[in-house]
Amino acid sequence: MTVANSASISADIAGRYAQALFDLVRDSGGIDALSSQIDDLASAYDASQDLRDLTLSPLYDRQQQEAAVGALSERMGLSAELANTLRLLARNRRLFTLPQFVAKLRNLIADAKGEVTADVVSAQALTDEQKARLADTLAAKSGKTVKLNARVDESLIGGMIVKLGSQMIDSSIRSKLASLQNAMKEVG
């Protein structure tokens, strides 16, 4: 099995659990609460090496994983639906898919709200006004509300790279210089 196949299988597994939880929560009208809880869970996962170890290490058995996510859910005040889904992931030895589970849930929630996320990499930090104008422009093109994930990469020299769904717009000076360099190689 290749790494790509393994990642695809993990995403597929996570997608099934995420879809089931999303359907359950959507029917009860708790999408906004779920969105907030998923953000909290993702932050906890990113901040805690112990939590990442718990989800990835084969040294923990089902009962230990289930007890740990149960305690975590209670401490974080997660909804019964999310807590039970996390316990089920642990019971079925699927906690390793937690990052894909969170990503899939975020996508489902964004689709339900008519939102799309744009990843923006710029050479300098964008001002709030620039972010608002960019979000408005992208919203006009996509017909959906746009949330920006902005980060800075000084190696771009200037400009930015915007990824919206499957589209990418690269207006960075670094890419323009690379194109110019390639064009000069063809001439000379």
Swiss-Prot record:
Gene3D superfamilies: N-terminal domain of the delta subunit of the F1F0-ATP synthase
UniProt GO MF annotations: proton-transporting ATP synthase activity, rotational mechanism
Major subcellular site: membrane
Entry annotated with the keyword Cell inner membrane: yes
Record membrane topology: Peripheral membrane protein
Organism superkingdom: Bacteria
Location of the protein in the cell: Cell inner membrane
Any Pfam family hit: OSCP
Function, in words: F(1)F(0) ATP synthase produces ATP from ADP in the presence of a proton or sodium gradient. F-type ATPases consist of two structural domains, F(1) containing the extramembraneous catalytic core and F(0) containing the membrane proton channel, linked together by a central stalk and a peripheral stalk. During catalysis, ATP synthesis in the catalytic domain of F(1) is coupled via a rotary mechanism of the central stalk subunits to proton translocation. This protein is part of the stalk that links CF(0) to CF(1). It either transmits conformational changes from CF(0) to CF(1) or is implicated in proton conduction.
Assembly mode: F-type ATPases have 2 components, F(1) - the catalytic core - and F(0) - the membrane proton channel. F(1) has five subunits: alpha(3), beta(3), gamma(1), delta(1), epsilon(1). F(0) has three main subunits: a(1), b(2) and c(10-14). The alpha and beta chains form an alternating ring which encloses part of the gamma chain. F(1) is attached to F(0) by a central stalk formed by the gamma and epsilon chains, while a peripheral stalk is formed by the delta and b chains.
Protein name per the record: ATP synthase subunit delta
Gene name per UniProt: atpH
